[in-house]
Amino acid sequence: MASRKEALARRASRVRRQIKAVANGRPRLSVHRSSKNIYAQIIDDVAGKTLASASTLEADLRSSLKTGADVAAAAVVGKLVAERGVKAGVKDVVFDRGAFIYHGRIKAVAEAAREGGLNF
């Protein structure tokens, strides 16, 4: 029986393998969720660089949000990363949910990023 950490790593690698197959050179919008915060970044895997990022740890977001661990905070992060991505010249991305299911905070980031101008 695999430990929880091994199972998460295996699930994340399976998702990333599927993303790599359909990416066609597009950068990926990678989302990570912890119990207290949420992080999102647009990564260009070809160049190995992060093009834009946002998280609930940023000073301006921490002061305006009640907590970094709810759906409202995730939506703000999604909107912010989309805004920064469009400013960096990124329109089309592939969504990398990692080992997390597409529900709740992960879904809120994705929907807010779509509203912010990213296509996936």
From Swiss-Prot:
GO BP term, pick one: translation
Source lineage: Bacteria, Pseudomonadati, Pseudomonadota, Alphaproteobacteria, Hyphomicrobiales
Family: Belongs to the universal ribosomal protein uL18 family.
One cellular component term from this protein's GO annotations in UniProt: cytosolic large ribosomal subunit
Gene name per UniProt: rplR
Keywords noted in UniProt: Ribonucleoprotein, Ribosomal protein, RNA-binding, rRNA-binding
GO MF, one annotated term: structural constituent of ribosome
The name this protein goes by in its record: Large ribosomal subunit protein uL18
Subunit structure: Part of the 50S ribosomal subunit; part of the 5S rRNA/L5/L18/L25 subcomplex. Contacts the 5S and 23S rRNAs.
InterPro entries to which the protein is assigned, alphabetical: Ribosomal_uL18_bac-type (IPR004389), Ribosomal_uL18_bac/euk (IPR005484)
Source species of the chain: Agrobacterium fabrum (strain C58 / ATCC 33970) (Agrobacterium tumefaciens (strain C58))
Gene3D superfamilies: 3.30.420.100
Function: This is one of the proteins that bind and probably mediate the attachment of the 5S RNA into the large ribosomal subunit, where it forms part of the central protuberance.
